[in-house]
Amino acid sequence: MAIGAKRLVVGAHYGLRDWLAQRLTAVILAAYALFFAIYVLIVLSTKGALGYDEWAGMFVPVWSKVLALIAILALLYHAWIGMRDVWMDYVRPTGIRLALLVVTILWLVFCALWSAQILWSV
């Protein structure tokens, strides 16, 4: 006599890739935050204030824009993994879960495009 629904048996490494990806994106975000904090401290110690010119000046070099874009993409991927897991774990109706996943993807893609547009307009 079987009790409950049959469950699909998955491999031992189920979820490992997502766990590693989330840790990697967290390391990228921490490294960028450290870089950003050091930049702010250097500007504050040399100029005494942090105005628009200093903020915009940080994103003038292409390497700075690329680093910021990598950090933004890492943040968005980190958010995707987390939100996908929340929707998959806590939203039971398949239709609602699918709708939430699609809305999340669309929102994150919009944020990525908007961030790139802002970065390259400086």
Please report, for each region that a protein language model flagged, where it lies by residue:
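Membrane-embedded alpha-helical bundles that constitute the cytochrome b-like, heme-associated redox core
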Residues: 1-122
